[in-house]
């Protein structure tokens, strides 16, 4: 029990920066019909209620594809798609309305639950739906009439913001009205994308059957830049219509990112708590799509000294790194390069040039324990080499007692102390006995 309580306290403390960062921001959450149909759906709804209680402005856009298909099959109505978009004739439209209407009531009812001993106890959430979306027909494509399948014409963002300002969750379904008084069936991905853009949302969040976007090795891709998503989409499209909703979300995320939405996230509807893990932990659990990476390699400034000290102090205590005082770091901070992930310094290294000998020392290489099995050390080494080349240095050397093999695997060779610059030779600590390794700057 004690360990469990400790984990709870630590987890809560680690989430506080994200709670503060998200408060007052607008998130658009897209719940596809597959996510609603799955058994974990009520857990997702509870987590949405939790986000609301933390002061996050929420728009929930839901789809109903599998529910509509079930209704159509029961009525013996033919299911027709063209380019992954449903052909919605009048008979199909009636089933679309019924399925979407039922889900609206079900979601509203679940978010309204406030019984004792339930996750939403005392939440008292207001859920508002309305004619926030004005639609228009898709028309005819390649001779195929989409009938009552439509697209977004405009969004009443003022009405949505009014409800959000009043503390309500705005719930938007796949059926939207038109200026002619007709109803049209829209994809939830398009609605979520357009709403995110119009509201200038901080995040657009979608759910899928996988943990996120999976690479060819079956591993989760934690971050995608918008330019890389296109290649992923091409691969996914070859796999067929069963993943077309994921493809549409990824296409929407490109548009959203380019239009000012800070980040889009794709997470699993299978895993309980995935929404919270994605939003309130440093590395998340799914895939996030961004215009610029959340992880940056840059030169350090005086404001980074605290983060650098947190990285190197444990290694100094173990004798792996030579101890540096805060005062020394303040003087030498311009020699440091850091890797920053979501405003946390996760790796650092320094380059001390000896211009007369055209040689540089790479020192103080440190990586956060959570990232040591990644390639951050390699990324720093590459950046240090680039910096050395810009300084017209020809070689880089390191002094190390623990990481000899790591450097050798990357092309460094053991050398004698005589190759060091004279000033460095005079400072060499024979008692410490560090190995000297060197590499040419290419």
Curated annotation (Swiss-Prot):
SUPFAM superfamilies named in the record: Acyl-CoA N-acyltransferases (Nat) (SSF55729), Carbamate kinase-like (SSF53633)
Cellular component terms (Gene Ontology): cytoplasm
Cellular location(s): Cytoplasm
Domain N-acetyltransferase: 295-442
Top EC group: transferase
One Pfam family per UniProt: Acetyltransf_1
Catalytic activity, EC: 2.3.1.1
Keyword list, A-Z: Acyltransferase, Amino-acid biosynthesis, Arginine biosynthesis, Cytoplasm, Transferase
Major site of localization recorded for this protein: cytoplasm
GO biological process: L-arginine biosynthetic process
Assembly with partners or alone: Homohexamer.
Protein family according to the UniProt entry: Belongs to the acetyltransferase family. ArgA subfamily.
MF GO annotations: L-glutamate N-acetyltransferase activity
InterPro entries reported in the protein's UniProt record: AceGlu_kinase-like_sf, Acyl_CoA_acyltransferase, Asp/Glu/Uridylate_kinase, GNAT_dom, NAGS_kin, NH2A_AcTrfase
Protein name: Amino-acid acetyltransferase
Species of origin: Buchnera aphidicola subsp. Acyrthosiphon pisum (strain APS)
Pathway it works in: Amino-acid biosynthesis; L-arginine biosynthesis; N(2)-acetyl-L-ornithine from L-glutamate: step 1/4
Reactions catalysed, as given in the entry: L-glutamate + acetyl-CoA = N-acetyl-L-glutamate + CoA + H(+)
